[in-house]
Structures are given as C-alpha cells and as structure tokens.
Amino acid sequence: MGEPIRVLVTGAAGQIAYSLLYSIAKGDVFGKEQPLVLVLLDITPMMTVLEGVVMELQDCALPLLREVIPTDKEEVAFKDLDIAILVGSMPRREGMERKDLLKANVKIFKSQGAALDKYAKKTVKVVVVGNPANTNCLIASKSAPSIPKENFSCLTRLDHNRAKSQIALKLGVTSNDVKNVIIWGNHSSTQYPDVNHAKVNVKGKEVGVYEAIKDDSWLKGDFILTVQQRGAAVIKARKLSSAMSAAKAICDHVRDIWFGTPAGEFVSMGVISDGNSYGVPEDLLYSFPVVIKDKTWKFVEGLPINDFSREKMDLTAKELTEEKETAVEFLSSA
C-alpha cells in the first residue's frame, strides 16, 4: 500500500455525500490498494450532523480509511489535496431567480477556488457537482490561476448514465451494453443527450443506437426530454433531489480520471472548451465527449455533427455564455 491520498468532499453532511463517502472510503473509486484521508467540509451549523457522519465512517471499520477530518474551515479543508469533490452549493429555494442562485454560488466558488489556489497541491483534480455545476466550476477555476484549468471538471456523468440507461431500457439490454453516448453542454434542461455515435451490443453484435432502436422520432423527442428532465422527475416523486444516482456518477467520473477510460470508449464531462473542434466558444465549461489516459483528458475529435445536433449544441452554449457573463459580473463585485 502506498502513501494515503487526501480527498476532500464539500457539502459533506448532505444527501449526496452520505451516499458517496462510503463508496470512496471502501475503495470503489481509487482502488483497493490506495489508502486515503477523507476531509469533510461543511458550514458551521452542520458540524453536529457531520460528527454523526464521521462516527458512521469510523464504525464501518474500513481498512483503507486512515483518517477522517471534519471541518468548517477552508484552510484546513483544502490543504495538500490530491482530489477535491465540490458537492456543496447554495440550493435553489422556492421563488428564487436563477440569477440570485448564481450570485450566491459565485461567492462560494470564488472563495473555494482561492483556497485551492493557496492550500492545495498544484496537481489537484477538482470535480464540481454543486449546481449550477458548469458555471460554478468555471468560477472556481478562474479563482485558482496557479492550478491548470484542465484539472477542473464538472459532473455531467449523471446525465450520461441516465441516457445510457434509457437506451438500455428501450432495447431490453443492460446499461453495460450501451457505450459512447454524449452529453453536450450545460448540466441543465438545455443539455443535449446525443446518441448519433453511440453503440449497443445486441446479441453479441455491436450496432449503432439509431439502427438498433429504429424509432427516430423517439430518439429526437421523448428520449432527449426524459434525460433533460430526469432530475426534476426524481424531485417530484421523491421530494428530494437525486442522491444515490448522483453519488454513483461522481464515483464513475473520478474513477475514470484516476484510472483512465476503457479502450474504444468515451465519457462525458464538463471541461474547459479551449481548443475544441466542435465550434463551441472558448472559455466555457461545457460538457464534451472525452477520453482519459494518465489522469489527463482529451477531446474525442472528428465526430460528424448533423444540423439537428448543431442547433442543440449551440442552444446550450448560448445558455452557458449568458450564465458566464452574469457570473463574471458578480465575480468582480464578490
């Protein structure tokens, strides 16, 4: 066993973290040989709840978990980190405009970005989950100029997994049989789930999803809407936002950063758009298809984009540009 790595989870007393921490601590993400120190950050009023989470983690008696550090202080939380998973954000309250939500979160992610810049390792990998995830991630990155912007990514893997699962359900196969779906753009209802390049294994034969499903109107209509609105559907049914599925998606996302993507497969994650070949404006945190090797992601290049896709990709880029402009305005005054 090597040296322990330091992993931070923010919003650590919350729903998603409760599903996530056990998976990380038992080795599902960084492997069964990698010891770790878990650092748990939350706001001061949540410290008592967080103590309960720490007790439970201790009571799991997990061999890889060397230490658990609960804190409400950024200088403790961000010190010498290898990985930061930023789950905590200001939730949208009833009657709250998206603009108000952005303003509250710019403040949080400016502060956390600055703390990463000051205290974390320069090689730290930062994954932003708290919504609006793409723009929060961009703000954190801009507030941490000494950390490469390629080290920042945001979670669209939940949308990616939702898309895989809908295709699998439609065809009566397992999600494992579906690969190379793409989520383009924002983790919002403008995201574009694209299966033009996706493949499915049907009775041992790999075929394109359009060819396998033979229902273009579903693929261009209800399928896209279902994935775009899935989060809202879960809230409506459960009265709480997705936690178990979000935690699983975070594990998938971070494991792929750590160990790389399987040969012949690509995944979706929100990354900085600089240098992309898909006509997405620079300096946006936009979800693309990527492959990962040696902890470094690269865009999947050369995928043909039809007019239907182009329109959807531009629409979500427009929303992200507007979000960014609003956030950057707040950033200068935060």
Swiss-Prot record:
One of its GO terms (molecular function) is L-malate dehydrogenase (NAD+) activity. It catalyses: (S)-malate + NAD(+) = oxaloacetate + NADH + H(+); (S)-2-hydroxyglutarate + NAD(+) = 2-oxoglutarate + NADH + H(+). NAD(+) binds at residues 11-17, 105, 112, 129-131. Substrate binds at residues 92, 98, 131, 162. Keywords: Cytoplasm, NAD, Oxidoreductase, Tricarboxylic acid cycle. GO terms for biological process: gluconeogenesis; malate metabolic process; tricarboxylic acid cycle. HAMAP family: Malate_dehydrog_2 (MF_01517). This is Malate dehydrogenase, cytoplasmic. The lineage of its organism: Eukaryota, Metazoa, Chordata, Craniata, Vertebrata.
